[in-house]
Amino acid sequence: RFNPDIVCVGEMRSSEAYSAQEAARTGHTVLTTIHSNSCESTYRRMVTLCKRKYDISDETLMSLVTEAFPIIVFSKQLEDRKRKVMEIMECEILPDGNRNYRTLYHYNIVENRLEGDRFIIHGEHERVQGISESLKKRFLENGMPKEQLVRWEGEEA
């Protein structure tokens, strides 16, 4: 029996999505990649992949994957061929079971032009909102030093 600090799933392409969410919901830190079109659609994609292994309702699987992966980082290759983190989102599960999708950071494109045969794209990352109280609690319970969390929250102001 192993007790890894971090589980890395190179890319979720099939039923390994179910195993990844199981590991994440049992206290392991799981890092993985998946192809999707946005932060929010990433959860629906995980549900689809999990269903390749188990016949579980979409709603149950959505509950499992949003609990397992509260933070999604969405990156995309833009027309200038550079990859950018476009959005970082938290899925907060509310006490009534509903979900609140919170955009934490967003990449704002401030210039997008064609120069000859090259695209020129400039932008900047913008903090949209802070993390939820429940995620702060989860970070602290899982070992994030309080000083680090306070310092990070200070950057939110």
Features from the language model and the residues they span:
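Switch/coupling sub-region of P-loop NTPases
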Residues: 1-68, 76-77
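Context-gated lysine
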Residues: 51-53, 76, 82-84, 136-137, ...
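A general structural signal for short secondary-structure boundary/capping elements
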Residues: 55-57, 77-79, 117-125
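Phosphate-binding/switch region of NTP-binding enzymes
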Residues: 63-96
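NTP-binding/hydrolysis catalytic cores, primarily Walker-type P-loop NTPases
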Residues: 87-157
